[in-house]
Regions:
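Conserved glycine-rich cofactor-binding loop
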Residues: 18-19
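Substrate-binding pocket helix/loop in short-chain dehydrogenase/reductase
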Residues: 91-93, 100-103
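Active-site helix of classical SDR
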Residues: 116, 151-152
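A short, exposed helix-loop element centered on a Lys and neighboring polar residues
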Residues: 116-117, 160
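Residue(s) in the substrate-gating loop at a strand-loop-helix junction
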Residues: 136
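Active-site-adjacent segment of SDR/Rossmann-fold oxidoreductases
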Residues: 161-171
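C-terminal helical subdomain
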Residues: 175-176, 195-242
Length: 247
């Protein structure tokens, strides 16, 4: 990946690539000169994206730790974008059943840890590599979903600690923390149709998947001696924290 401060764009892996931010990231990285591999469960969407971009498709569930570990052992990835994840229904934690809690933690936290654990030894041996995680503003601020927010707090902590754990090995870590993005997220996260429609009709000019993909591309394109540890990106009309008072 690096020679001095130069960046060599080799093999990149994008998980959860069949739609939204993942698909946009595949397009952005291919355009930027990376050899992109992508994973997702939806085979037809991957097939279409592969035909469009030339990226290499692997129909793998990101939660399938054995298959993901096999892939990273076969291909020496210089960049991994751990995008695959899910949103939790925006209900109280006590309304989430044990299976829903376990499923979300497995996909949003455990699968990311396992992927990094499988890839890091090879990156360290080559003394080059970059892992980019998809966090969320929900990992920074209380947004009203305890379960989802907890998983994104975990991802943020993961990246911060990996920066220390892998220090001196030539491996970079970045957590991208988007606000509202125009994707399928709310179709899953909000079960009540009326509430879902109300959220979508707030008038906020949401981020497009391409906006987040550009942030990912930019972080990955920095010189090898530059580590963008975290990047919060949100719509101009969305803000968290503090308080607003009448003028």
């Amino acid at each position: 990946m690096s020679k001095g401060n130069a960046l060599v764009k080799g093999n990149a892996l994008v998980t959860g690539a069949s739609a939204g931010i993942g698909a946009a990231t595949v397009r952005a990285l291919v355009a930027d000169g990376w050899t992109v591999h992508m994973t997702a469960r939806r085979a037809e969407r991957l097939k279409d994206l592969a035909a469009e971009t030339g990226a290499v498709a692997h129909v793998i569930d990101a939660a399938d730790q054995i298959a993901m570990a096999a892939l990273v052992s076969e291909v020496p990835f210089d960049l991994i974008v751990a995008n695959a994840g899910a949103g939790a229904a925006m209900t109280a934690l006590t309304d989430a059943g044990p299976s829903e809690i376990a499923q979300l933690v497995t996909l949003n936290v455990t699968s990311v840890l396992q992927l990094i654990s499988a890839a890091l030894p090879g990156m360290a041996a080559r003394r080059r590599g970059h892992v980019i995680t998809l966090g969320s503003v929900s990992g920074l601020y209380p947004t009203g979903s305890t379960l989802y927010g907890a998983t994104k707090h975990a991802v943020r902590g993961m990246v911060r600690n990996l920066r220390i754990e892998a220090l001196g090995q030539g491996v970079r870590f970045t957590d991208i923390q988007p606000g509202r993005v125009r994707t399928e997220f709310y179709d899953v996260a909000v079960k009540d149709a009326a509430k879902r429609d109300a959220i979508k009709e707030t008038g906020i000019d949401e981020l497009a998947p391409d906006d987040v993909a550009e942030a990912i591309r930019w972080a990955a394109a920095q010189p090898a001696h530059v580590n963008v540890t975290a990047l919060e990106i949100a719509p101009t009309d969305q803000a968290y924290g503090g308080a607003r008072f009448p003028e």
